């Protein structure tokens, strides 16, 4: 299994397929999360992400290995951005490649949900009149 784990200032959305391509893979699944313009009926102006980078990378590697073992993946990619991000900007990219599509679909969902639960990356939402640190959840 080959993994590509990074904390980055900007997400390169073009890297997913090129990295995940593998001669034994019949399926590739990629999830890209971006900043949406509202949360709970409030307009979002921007988000700010910060990470405990060394711990985040270790936990992302553990998650990638768990997924690989459970779904027999050829490759896993997990990139998360830090810093200030505006509406529509990508903030996270996760993906998996496997022999069959069902495995990579399930693995990709596990990767993003588990990243949000376990990885020490924090998000602050900026609204018109307030700022709020968000509690992690899948």
Predicted regions and their residues:
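Short hydrophobic/aromatic beta-strand micro-patches
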Residues: 95-97
């Amino acid at each position: 299994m080959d993994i590509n784990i990074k904390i980055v200032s900007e997400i390169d959305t073009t890297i997913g397929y090129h990295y995940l391509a593998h001669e034994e893979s019949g399926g590739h699944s990629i999830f890209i999360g971006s900043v949406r313009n509202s949360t709970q009926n409030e307009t979002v102006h921007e988000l700010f992400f910060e990470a405990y980078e060394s711990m985040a990378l270790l936990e992302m590697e553990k998650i990638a290995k768990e997924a690989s073992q459970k779904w027999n993946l050829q490759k896993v990619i997990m990139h998360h951005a830090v810093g200030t991000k505006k509406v529509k900007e990508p903030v996270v990219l996760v993906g998996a490649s496997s022999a069959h599509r069902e495995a990579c679909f399930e693995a990709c969902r596990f990767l993003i949900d588990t990243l949000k639960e376990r990885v020490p990356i924090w998000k602050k939402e900026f609204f018109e009149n307030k700022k709020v640190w968000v509690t992690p959840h899948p």
